A protein has these predicted regions:
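N-terminal leader/targeting segments
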Residues: 1-90, 94-96, 317, 500-517
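Non-globular, low-confidence helical/coil segments that flank catalytic cores
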Residues: 145-148, 154-161, 179, 388, ...
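Hydrophobic alpha-helical segments of integral membrane proteins
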Residues: 207-222, 234, 242, 250, ...
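Membrane-interface helix/helix-cap signal primarily in integral membrane proteins
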Residues: 2-5, 57-66, 70-261, 587, ...
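Membrane-helix interface and helix-disruption motif detector
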Residues: 28-39, 360, 419, 482-487
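Hydrophobic alpha-helical segments
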Residues: 1-29, 328-329, 334-336, 442-473
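Hydrophobic alpha-helical transmembrane segments in multi-pass membrane proteins
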Residues: 14, 22, 59, 189, ...
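Divalent metal-coordination and catalytic microenvironments
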Residues: 22, 101, 160, 238, ...
Length: 657
């Protein structure tokens, strides 16, 4: 109970809650046509009032000062997220134009294309005029043998259509365009071969670019070791956060086993690495002020580790939290400095970038650490074990249960699945992750040493293979994963409330009151009641046309419909998916009734030919069609008086069945 009371009494915790609430509410509800400057004017007024109250320093006005300060940070959060959104959003031309930019990340292979983040600096207007843009996009390009390959830091000139990706939220619950916007990316584009050129090599790289290049060089070293593909992919992900080589099958194995967190560089890896460093440099503690020197040395080395891993947001967040915790230990011996440093880290990161609040890894990371700080002492003290090995096992299980308990509402809300054997998997993961980290850094140092280097690399490969096989074994156990348990936002909030009430009840110990049990039971009953109402409600089944596929969705269940001929019958509704030239040679004595003709990339022919075979009620033009062919089909629809829907304008089309 003391942990929570100490946290609530911490002024920065209250201000952080106000800041986060402002970010969330303004991002969700602020009208798009209303400028953030109106809120800024009110904020300046509140800052003046807050300063005046602080200067007067009357004890009886302390609540007023606290309230005004809370509203001030609430508005600051809202204004900052609106300003951040404005700096990312851009009205791109609705057609291909020429752009100039700089490659900001290391290009990665995506099927037949390469993709990288590009900082678009200029857009060409009519004539020889150029317009300043200064926005980041995800640029994909087809390899061109006539142009030198692009690398991080290169200047590039390309001809392409830049646009914001269409939202998939109605179908999948995920808005890719909004996701990119919160990552600071304004749009996406595809440049075909011959439509891009490398116009210059960099004289100097930015600090972030140097980190990305450093990360790629480490990946190149891993590739030179001749490891198996899955082994190299896991080593790259586990040690430096490079996940592009992870296959969907490998990700599914770790997800089902409840160990996917080991593939995302985060606090677990920083914690393991810091333990290794503390053990290596422990002799420094025998010197005068040795403990402080050791702590500062570990912090510096952790920031070096963050640089090598490409300064990814997850590892930077973990290192910031560790650094603040170390600083707090210098300034205070208070028991709750860990919780305070966690709040300070969240506050500083939201001030720096308010979009962090919507990052799933940010939410999971802070929820896990908060839950560990709260629940781990309760779990670990619940059993008194004297045997060292058994105590280590119990402490590891306590850590896993604490983290899983805090992240449970987020996992069920975002992913709708729960790994049943996560405790078994994490017993293996924690040990082998540490072994792989040690062997990897040893291999980097000793790879050039004859015999010794090859031996370490072989041990690394064996250790990673054991990890992969162990996770496959856990995945193959009966009932290894509970799926399709999606929670609504209200259910997730109530489940979080249940967990908080459970903590309050457990932490009270012998001082537990009847009110603690009543509070827990009330929230549990609310959660059950809301769940019953939401699951009992009938949701209509809907038909979707999106990305050259036909889907049906009922609640959280999405099904894809395909056939060899392209003809579908869904609820007595006839649909044709047209993506080839097969219908050009067909003839018919009578026209077949067709509710929807879904024309996609690859279709050869014309609507006049289709009109002889089918009585089409509505044509749907997929966004994959090129502009000239789409315009031709639209003219034919108008001529034949057939209604049509252009998905290049709205992204997807849905019908209630």
């Amino acid at each position: 109970m003391g942990t929570l009371h100490s946290l609530i009494a911490y002024p920065l915790f209250r201000l952080t809650i106000c800041l986060a609430t402002g970010i969330f509410l303004f991002d969700t509800w602020w009208p798009e046509n209303l400028s953030w400057q109106y809120g800024a004017a009110i904020w300046l007024l509140l800052v003046g009032v807050c300063g005046g109250l602080f200067w007067l320093s009357h004890w009886r006005w302390r609540w007023l000062f606290g309230g005004v300060a809370g509203v001030t940070f609430f508005l600051w959060g809202g204004i900052s997220v609106l300003h951040q959104r404005e700096t990312v959003q851009y009205s791109w031309a609705g057609e291909p134009v020429i752009y100039k930019g700089i490659v900001e990340s290391v290009p990665e292979v995506r099927g037949k294309t390469l993709r990288a983040e590009v900082r678009v600096e200029m857009q060409r207007l009519s004539g020889r005029k150029w317009k300043r843009v200064d926005r980041n996009i995800l640029l994909s390009w087809m390899p061109d043998s006539l142009s030198s390959p692009l690398a991080c830091g290169d200047s590039v000139c390309f001809y392409a259509k830049v646009s914001r990706p269409f939202s998939e939220k109605e179908l999948t619950g995920f808005d890719y365009g909004d996701y990119l916007l919160r990552k600071g990316i304004s749009g996406t584009a595809l440049a075909y071969a011959g439509n891009w050129r490398c116009t210059g090599k960099p004289h100097s790289l930015s600090f972030m670019q140097r980190a990305k290049v450093c990360q790629q060089k480490v990946v190149d070293v891993y590739q030179s070791w001749g490891l198996e593909e899955d082994v190299q992919a896991v080593v790259s992900a586990l040690t430096i956060g490079e996940k592009s080589e992870l296959t969907p099958e490998l990700k599914a194995v770790y997800s089902a086993a409840g160990a996917s967190h080991v593939l995302a560089l985060s606090g677990l890896h920083v914690g393991i690495f810091s333990c290794i460093l503390l053990w290596l440099f422990y002799p420094l503690t025998y010197l005068k002020h040795g403990r402080k020197v050791l702590a500062l040395l570990v912090v510096c080395l952790l920031w070096g580790f963050a640089f090598i891993s490409g300064l990814s947001s997850s590892v930077v967040r973990a290192v910031v939290m560790y650094s603040l915790y170390t600083l707090a230990s210098f300034c205070s011996e208070e028991r709750f400095s860990g919780m305070h440093s966690l709040v300070l880290a969240a506050f500083l990161m939201l001030i720096y970038n308010p979009f962090f609040l919507f990052d799933i890894s940010f939410q999971l990371s802070f929820a896990a650490v908060f839950s560990i700080l709260a629940f781990y002492p309760l779990f670990s003290r619940s059993l008194c074990i004297k045997n060292r090995v058994l105590r280590y096992i119990w402490n590891t299980l306590s850590l896993s249960m604490s983290a899983q308990l805090g992240t449970l509402p987020f996992i069920l809300y975002y992913f709708g699945s729960f790994p049943t054997y996560f405790l078994l998997a994490n017993l293996v993961v924690v040990i082998l992750a540490g072994v792989i980290l040690v062997l990897t850094f040893a291999a980097l140092c000793l790879a050039s040493v004859p015999i010794v280097g090859n031996t370490v690399i072989t041990l690394l490969e064996w250790g990673t293979l054991i990890l992969n096989k162990s996770m496959q074994g856990v995945q193959q156990l009966a009932g290894s994963q509970i799926t399709s348990v999606y929670l609504s936002s209200s259910q997730a909030c109530l489940l979080a409330g249940v967990i908080i009430c459970l903590y309050l009840c457990w932490a009270s110990g012998i001082h537990r009151k009847a009110s603690d049990w009543i509070r827990l039971l009330v929230v549990c009953n609310l959660f059950v009641a809301v769940s019953c109402v939401e699951y009992a409600g009938e949701a209509p089944e809907q038909l979707y046309f999106f990305r050259s596929e036909v889907y049906t969705r009922k609640k959280d269940c999405v099904s894809t419909h395909r056939s060899e001929t392209g003809l579908l019958c869904i609820r007595n509704m006839h649909i044709a998916v047209l993506n080839d030239a097969r219908w050009r040679t067909y003839e018919a004595s009578s026209r077949f009734p067709l509710e929807y003709a879904y024309i996609c990339r690859g279709f050869k022919g014309s609507l006049s030919q289709l009109d002889k075979l089918f009585a089409i009620r509505q044509v749907i033009l997929d966004s994959s069609l090129n502009d000239a062919f789409r315009e031709k089909l639209i003219r034919e629809c108008q001529l034949l008086k057939i209604s049509y829907t252009d998905l290049s304008v709205q992204g997807s089309y849905s019908v209630v069945l």
